[in-house]
Design a protein with these regions (language model features):
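Alpha/beta enzyme core
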Residues: 1, 7-15, 28-154, 170-171
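A glycine-rich helix N-cap at a beta->alpha junction
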Residues: 19-24
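Thiamine diphosphate
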Residues: 159-171
């Protein structure tokens, strides 16, 4: 966190009817959940709710992170389990989900299932590039439901690059 964010979270008691959410990324590869500075900053925000962003597109896992698909799942699940052990409500923000689903349906579905099994209260499906059309979003979510995924624990994080964020959120 930076000083401005820290000051904001220090004032959280002033917001009687709001639920603040600390946002950060999963632990980094090669670090434990207890020794990852970024994850520690999310915890130290003092919120009851945390949203973690993690990769759900195999291309980004292998090229941007330079790790295996299984190693990425371990980053996600261990981070979620750690936060749940601290009593946090956890939202997992599945970055590049819709592009990842189009490229490797099996892996993207496994990310959602593993995050939920690890204890994520919500899995938020991201149209990170903002290029999805409403039909694609609807068909993807229908596929997840057919795979036995609990739709009541799914959210959407639609970007508006093609002016479809509202339509995609309603799809």
């Amino acid at each position: 966190a930076n000083p401005i964010d820290s000051e904001f979270f220090d004032r959280k008691k002033e917001f009687a009817k709001s639920k603040l959410v600390a946002f950060g990324m999963t632990k980094r590869f090669g670090r434990s959940v207890e020794n990852d500075e970024t994850l520690a900053q999310v915890v130290s925000a003092g919120t009851s709710v945390v949203c973690l962003v993690g990769k759900s597109h195999d291309f980004h896992v292998q090229k941007a992170l330079g790790i295996s698909l299984d190693e990425n799942i371990e980053l996600i699940t261990s981070s979620i389990k750690h936060l749940k052990s601290l009593g946090k409500e956890v939202h997992f923000d599945a970055e590049h989900f819709f592009d990842g689903f189009a490229a490797n349906k099996k892996y993207s579905i496994s990310i959602v299932k593993e995050a939920m099994a690890a204890g994520a209260d919500w899995v938020v499906l991201c149209d990170t590039n903002g290029g999805c059309m409403p039909d694609q979003v609807r068909e993807t979510i229908e596929s997840l439901i057919e795979e036995g995924i609990d739709s009541s624990r799914l959210g959407i994080h639609a970007h508006n690059d093609t002016e479809n964020a509202v339509a995609n959120s309603l799809a």
